[in-house]
Amino acid sequence: MIPLRSKVTTVGRNAAGARALWRATGTKENEFGKPIVAIVNSYTQFVPGHVHLKNVGDIVADAVRAAGGVPKEFNTIAVDDGIAMGHGGMLYSLPSREIIADSVEYMVNAHTADAMVCISNCDKITPGMLNAAMRLNIPVVFVSGGPMEAGKAVVVDGVAHAPTDLITAISASANDGVDDAGLLAVEQSACPTCGSCSGMFTANSMNCLTEALGLSLPGNGSTLATHSARRALFEKAGETVVKLCERYYGQEDESALPRSIATKKAFENAMALDMAMGGSTNTILHILAAAQEGEVDFDLADIDALSKRVPCLSKVAPNSDYHMEDVHRAGGIPAILGELNRGGLLNKDVHSVFSDDLESWLDEWDIRSGKASEEAIDLFHAAPGGIRTTEAFSTDNRWDSLDTDAENGCIHSIEHAHTADGGLVVLRGNIAPDGAVIKSAGIDEELWTFTGPARVVESQEEAVSVILNKTIQAGEVLVVRYEGPSGGPGMQEMLHPTAFLKGSGLGKKCALLTDGRFSGGSSGLSIGHVSPEAAHGGVIGLIEDGDIITIDIHNRVLDLGVSDEELERRRAAEEASDKPWQPKNRQRVVSKALRAYAKMATSADKGAVRQID
């Protein structure tokens, strides 16, 4: 047997003081010596994806206790990227991932917890907890708060907006054809319930990827926050983590640990899923970071290779009118993985927190397998309630039928793929020798080749001003630099610029290029993660107005039409300037906390993780 980590605080004379304190938290005599399971919650009233989680920890705790564990709950912080968007608050979003990971490590190691159930949901919370799980390598199960229901259709000035979501509201705000009353109607419909925003944005993308990594249960990524079916996921998470404890501590079975589950092959499967479902570009940052935390040899080159052979099987908002509730009706993540598996695109020799092998759990949970269990079929009938609410488990609505249309439905078969390439593409060239990323699933294929003159700005705020003041012209490439992990600092999301371009009618007429990043809600020719970033001496810092930029998604090229000699001349001039590799006219207050992150942050090709050594 492997001794419980918590034994140092619960067993023996030397632990008398710690036991006295444990008793003061409600620990009973017969609980000493049992595995302590940290219920890592993230409840907050600031974030709709987390507002319903206050009592969810109790559900998990009851299940842990019934299975023979000792539950102890704590909370992490949670930043709402949508509320933080478009102002200085967005500087804090990506760095909060590191704070969350550190806080989980601090709490779990300081109190010698034996295992964790991570109750996450929104953009940086799942990645932060995932980084912590890979770092700590103790038994863990992830269970998210679940996606929000899509908003109901609204008609504004004769134009239907159906169904609505956060991106609909932001785009409408920049559309001169939508008056204030129309905008109010859209925003009142856009976010009707608790849960992570309803499209295949960053939060839902990451929660889906935990299924493919093997660290969460089937349905985790797609079962609505409001549906009663989600309660069972929390209960099963509590039961499952205690079983993992028994396997690891009681049977010395290291296959129960996250690093044994989320191996390189599992990371490859997760990114194959990401390509197939057209996930957020932010997932690349977070998957690279998690791999580094778990000492998994998985990098941008691996992602590039996968994107060349895995097709895009599903287009979900912001790239279509489908939302997560539609993905769920089509069989959720098991259905997408099942299609990939039948196409020979998954590694089969992987296991999960609930199953010993991929084939058996896909047989049971893929509604297209012909062998799906009644439990699986029942789960994927869970439908939205259509009632505004902040309460979890508040609806029992059911779909009349499942979406099994592999040609025209929400999830296509490989034979009917949207594109032969994956929904995420890595571009390289003299602008981004270390890579840049674009969500190709959000772009009409006729726009996959684009050439235009650069319009250079040095902040997101300036980019928004250029768009809303209508000084950007069709055919231009808007270059937003010094917004990378170090240069921002914090690598702001450019949701407002992309949404405002779309709302201004330029979404298919301009490109946007940045060393920052994009929201999962961004679409169009939005190229982010340019590496090296400007603050690290990247070529993006040398681009001048009027320089010709070529984007070729088919050939994965991002090129600046400037000679090497001219770039060297510009580089020499930049390095001889008073403030080399810094924005020249930007007014931005940067706090001590953000400056600390900036000093350690790597460029996006490394996951924007902190480099300490």
UniProtKB/Swiss-Prot annotation:
Domain of life: Bacteria
List of residues that carry N6-carboxylysine: 124
Pathway(s) where this gene product acts: Amino-acid biosynthesis; L-isoleucine biosynthesis; L-isoleucine from 2-oxobutanoate: step 3/4; Amino-acid biosynthesis; L-valine biosynthesis; L-valine from pyruvate: step 3/4
Residue numbers binding Mg(2+): 81, 123-124, 493
Catalysed conversion reaction: (2R)-2,3-dihydroxy-3-methylbutanoate = 3-methyl-2-oxobutanoate + H2O; (2R,3R)-2,3-dihydroxy-3-methylpentanoate = (S)-3-methyl-2-oxopentanoate + H2O
Gene Ontology terms, MF aspect: 2 iron, 2 sulfur cluster binding; dihydroxy-acid dehydratase activity; magnesium ion binding
Entry keyword set: 2Fe-2S, Amino-acid biosynthesis, Branched-chain amino acid biosynthesis, Iron, Iron-sulfur, Lyase, Magnesium, Metal-binding
Sequence positions that bind [2Fe-2S] cluster: 122, 197
UniProt enzyme class: lyase
Cofactor or coenzyme needed: [2Fe-2S] cluster; Mg(2+)
Single GO cellular component term: cytosol
PROSITE patterns: ILVD_EDD_1 (PS00886), ILVD_EDD_2 (PS00887)
Record-listed E.C. numbers: 4.2.1.9
Active site: 519
Cofactor note: Binds 1 [2Fe-2S] cluster per subunit. This cluster acts as a Lewis acid cofactor.
GO biological process: isoleucine biosynthetic process; L-valine biosynthetic process
Binding partners and assembly: Homodimer.
Family affiliation: Belongs to the IlvD/Edd family.
NCBIfam families for the chain: ilvD, PRK12448.1
Described purpose of this protein according to its UniProt entry: Functions in the biosynthesis of branched-chain amino acids. Catalyzes the dehydration of (2R,3R)-2,3-dihydroxy-3-methylpentanoate (2,3-dihydroxy-3-methylvalerate) into 2-oxo-3-methylpentanoate (2-oxo-3-methylvalerate) and of (2R)-2,3-dihydroxy-3-methylbutanoate (2,3-dihydroxyisovalerate) into 2-oxo-3-methylbutanoate (2-oxoisovalerate), the penultimate precursor to L-isoleucine and L-valine, respectively.
UniProt xrefs under PANTHER family: D-XYLONATE DEHYDRATASE, D-XYLONATE DEHYDRATASE YAGF-RELATED
The protein's name in its UniProt record: Dihydroxy-acid dehydratase 1
UniProt organism field: Corynebacterium efficiens (strain DSM 44549 / YS-314 / AJ 12310 / JCM 11189 / NBRC 100395)
Gene name of this polypeptide: ilvD1
